[in-house]
């Protein structure tokens, strides 16, 4: 079964802001003036250095432009190229790294309005995540309220490594707003760099940074479970984006084991954590951190205990695979269909309105 014939839903596409000038028309005048006066040139995400090989596949790069900055190229290469009927835009412009809560909120508003006008209005296959200023949970919840009426926004986007563990109750206004509107919360690889990306200090190399993101996802997933987010918001879905997933079986076993022995301190977690995670957490497919030949990947998926966990993604334009190999070839046809179509539709209720 070819990936090109199934009409999948790509759950992780990265549109790039070509330059800060593109957002000026969407910024409040106060902040447009501040950009000019302060000489702000761009808000490129440090988590994805512009010229690092990972940031863009060689055949998806364009001389003199940011990979992902052209809507036409993104739709041609990522949607047409893989036969996808729809794609979710996760914009990683570094709004969450700003120290000013008000400035972050202004840029989040501008970025979401830019996505709506320059991307969603111009291709009916595109959907997007709401970028929010995580620096201020009340302002983030306000941005969710502002944008939730536009049904083309199907998710709320947070960075994996922010100022604090994501389960903390100070962040619950974000989850409450998302749950009220039926929006999953997507947690994407990346850091605001308020803290080291490893538990023992700052690394020397980008390789260390990116590899350690998987550990960051495990930390945040533990926080969400143990702090009671899933217990408080039982309808909430969380999607770990670009997290990898092959670490999940061992992680579930460890979390379950120590919950059994220590659950007296977290009585609100009143059922086994693996059960909670299998019901309320999903993972995008790329990167696949396992051999795609042989049965290793199938054994990992079997150990994870559910065929509903994975959502198709290319991670465009990030370089996670070559050619058309976005979907591991040895997966059973029934599982391919679930990853490509059924699981995304079950995770994102708003997609069912147009693509079911």
Predicted regions and their residues:
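Helix-coil boundary/capping segments in enzymes
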Residues: 1-356
